[in-house]
Amino acid sequence: ETLPEPARTGWFDYDHFYSDHVFEEELPILRRETSFRSVCDVGGNTGKFALAAASFDPEVKVTIADLPEQCAAAKEKIAAAGLSKRIALNPCDILKSSPADLPQGIDVWWMSQFLDCFNNDQAVRILRLVRGAMEDGAVLAVNEIFGDRQKRDTAALVVDECSLYFTAIANGVSRFFNSGEFMECLAAAGFRVRSVRDGLGLGHTLIIAEKA
């Protein structure tokens, strides 16, 4: 949110173009997997998924856990949508947080293209943090793009080239995972994969996992 214009608008228009096409497909899948009534969007960014989840089911309560500046930006959009009573904000630095810093009583812990902003050790640390906050019966739902799970070679090449862009331009760490590498991170953090669905949106994969 601290990007200067026109970079800020350009980046979020690009990012939202992909995410906006996948949330409407993934929420019904989540509903079939679990009768959730609460969701925590870890790394909720501008609140796009939180707004989609709240609109999907009027009984669902959503919490965004992200940096204070991201929560402040999301707050404006949430208020504009008239959903301030159903979408809560949990400002925190995930890398410096403990399970006690995260909301309680959450059914679905959601991460959308969030862990690919970190190196493997950091991703495992974040996953362990969330696992520590999860109650029995809760699930982890991860929306990611994997080059090795694309249906066509051209799509895989596009994902891999975008990954190189993120590493070189963003922060030197961001990149898209290889799916096998990501599964290893989940296992290292104490998760067992329940289901994997490819080909959602414009090439996303939805992984639903639970505590091992």
Language-model regions: role of each:
Residues E1-R37:
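Conserved Class I S-adenosyl-L-methionine-dependent methyltransferase catalytic core
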Residues E33, S38-A212:
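Alpha-helical subdomain
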